[in-house]
């Protein structure tokens, strides 16, 4: 009898150990709200489904809602205690800090071996966070906000030199009427670039520069994602843009466009966070884990984004999408090779978001005709 009891206890202990060693069960569904382009987000979700099946034995049904960052944040606030998505992904970290402070996100633990590969910050003289020290969000990939330009239009038709700095946009009168941009109150990415200028030059000189930029602007498009399209078609020579918001896709489709991130350009770590009271928190955690694996990071590399892990870089066989991305970016392969200038202050940007938008509407957008006459 004792021998039988010992045998039963041993079997129970072995079963318990097996269960504890097995991966935690995840929900069979995952919903994401994101400004990240479908070129990236759909591929990531499809790859995650394969990864989740192999690791957890679960067929995860995924869906995503494509929204600009500001619209996504607004929806999350509207949803309140009944969110219609599990994850918010992409955009500017300052908006994630605001959501966290207002109680719309939950802290989550990323596997230590993956989290430790990501540096706390990047850039000088103002270090830019790549992961939230409080644990509400973590960066997934690096993407600069900068200038997209039509190389043929700039060099052959206008006989101008492609821009390398912010100053170059306004230094050549040939660019007057050749710039496209979205207003900062309609685009969080454009708002971030406005803040880069304001923090670089100071409030008064920054607005003077932005006023001249408005005078040189041929069109204020409805969305930031529209800028690469009008530049690719040759309707305008250059404009503020985010690579994954159609710029790199247009390049892959044969458009004669290139991208430059001027010194001090904002670089988003494409943050990701779990929404409080979401329906599928374990699937959400698993998706974040997947994006930080080598497999997830390579997915970004193959779509023109930079890895958030220093030991990885954008490279691939000749003619690969990764190598085409290097051409598109003017030779850059990593944001961890060499010095990255950053003066963008998250706290300052957060504290005056409404003030910046109000100033733009009242002193620039409402006075466009006068500014065009002045400059």
Residue ranges of each PLM-predicted region?
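Short, low-complexity disordered leader/linker segments with a strong preference
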Residues: 1-29
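Early extracytoplasmic/lumenal segment of secretory-pathway proteins
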Residues: 24-98, 228
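Short beta-strand->loop
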Residues: 33-36, 131-142, 149-151, 156-158, ...
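A structural signal for short loop-to-beta-strand junctions that line the ligand-binding cleft
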Residues: 83-88, 106-151, 178
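A bilobed periplasmic-binding-protein/Venus flytrap-type ligand-binding module shared by bacterial periplasmic
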Residues: 148-153, 268-282, 299-300
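Periplasmic-binding protein-like
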Residues: 179-182, 290-311
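Ligand-binding pocket segment of bilobal, Venus flytrap-like solute-binding proteins
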Residues: 196-261
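Conserved C-terminal helix/tail region of periplasmic/extracytoplasmic solute-binding proteins
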Residues: 336-375
């Amino acid at each position: 009898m004792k021998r039988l009891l010992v045998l039963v206890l041993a079997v129970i202990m072995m079963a318990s150990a097996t269960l504890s060693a097995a991966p935690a069960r995840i929900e069979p569904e995952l919903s994401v709200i994101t400004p990240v382009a479908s070129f990236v987000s759909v591929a990531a979700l499809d790859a995650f489904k394969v990864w989740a099946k192999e690791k957890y034995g679960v067929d995860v049904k995924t869906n995503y809602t494509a929204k600009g960052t500001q619209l996504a944040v607004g929806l999350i606030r509207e949803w309140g205690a009944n969110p219609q998505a599990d994850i918010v992904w992409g955009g500017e970290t300052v908006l994630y800090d605001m959501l966290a402070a207002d109680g719309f996100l939950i802290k989550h633990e990323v596997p230590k071996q993956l989290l430790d590969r990501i540096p706390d910050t990047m850039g000088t003289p103002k270090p830019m966070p790549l992961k939230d020290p409080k644990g509400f969000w973590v960066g997934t990939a690096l993407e600069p906000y900068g200038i997209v330009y039509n190389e043929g239009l700039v060099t052959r038709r206008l006989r101008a030199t492609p821009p390398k700095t912010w100053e170059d946009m306004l230094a050549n009168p040939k660019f007057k009427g050749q710039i496209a941009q979205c207003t900062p109150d309609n685009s969080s990415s454009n708002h971030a670039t406005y803040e880069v200028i304001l923090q670089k030059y100071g409030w008064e000189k920054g607005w003077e520069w932005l006023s001249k930029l408005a005078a040189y602007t041929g069109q204020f498009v409805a969305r930031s994602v529209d800028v690469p399209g009008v530049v690719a078609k040759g309707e305008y020579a250059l404009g503020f843009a985010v690579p994954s918001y159609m710029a790199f896709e247009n390049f892959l489709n044969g458009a004669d466009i290139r991208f430059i991130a001027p010194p001090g350009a904002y670089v988003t770590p494409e943050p990701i966070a779990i929404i409080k009271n979401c329906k599928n928190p374990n699937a959400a955690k698993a998706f974040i884990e997947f994006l930080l694996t080598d497999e997830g990071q390579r997915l970004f590399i193959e779509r023109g984004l930079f890895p958030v892990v220093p030991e990885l870089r954008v490279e691939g066989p000749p003619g690969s999408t990764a190598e085409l991305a290097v051409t598109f970016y003017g030779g850059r392969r990593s944001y961890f090779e060499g010095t990255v200038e950053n003066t963008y202050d998250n706290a300052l940007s957060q504290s005056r978001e409404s003030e910046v938008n109000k100033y733009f509407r009242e002193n620039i957008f409402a006075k466009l005709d006068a500014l065009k006459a002045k400059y």
